Amino acid sequence: SLSDKDKAAVRALWSKIGKSADAIGNDALSRMIVVYPQTKTYFSHWPDVTPGSPHIKAHGKKVMGGIALAVSKIDDLKTGLMELSEQHAYKLRVDPANFKILNHCILVVISTMFPKEFTPEAHVSLDKFLSGVALALAERYR
């Protein structure tokens, strides 16, 4: 679970990178569909599933909006993300393993876009936070 130190590190990092959330989301989602092409199946209803396409950009923005929500609900991710968990479990039917895949892509993008801010301490705290988000999103699958 997240310590107070982890929570503070995530909040501090988000305060520096949050204004770039749309770009992070686009790059992370674009990276995911290239590196893990099987994830494209969730977006087969889109006319264009290429990196940086309008649909990828829009969904990347939506994903990072969810991350911003999670930062604001960091003290109780399970309750704070319940609605998103229900949506992903019952409506979208996303395999929860994909949350971990996207988390990895988000970490890679943040590390390349913000090398100074992405210290080893920030890395471990953000990784733990994103793992907590994935766990909270998977809650309704049980």
Curated annotation (Swiss-Prot):
CDD domains for this protein? Hb-alpha-like
Query: What GO molecular function annotations does the UniProt record carry, in alphabetical order?
Result: haptoglobin binding; heme binding; iron ion binding; organic acid binding; oxygen binding; oxygen carrier activity; peroxidase activity
Q: Specify which residues bind heme b according to the UniProt entry for this protein.
A: 88
- Could you tell me which SUPFAM superfamilies the record lists for this protein? Globin-like
The protein's UniProt keywords, in alphabetical order, are:
Acetylation, Heme, Iron, Metal-binding, Oxygen transport, Transport
InterPro entries in the record, alphabetically? Globin, Globin-like_sf, Globin/Proto, Hemoglobin_a-typ, Hemoglobin_oxygen_transport, Hemoglobin_pi
What the protein does comes down to: Involved in oxygen transport from gills to the various peripheral tissues.
* Entry similarity comment: Belongs to the globin family.
Q: In its UniProt entry, what is this protein called?
A: Hemoglobin subunit alpha
Source organism of the structure: Trematomus bernacchii (Emerald rockcod)
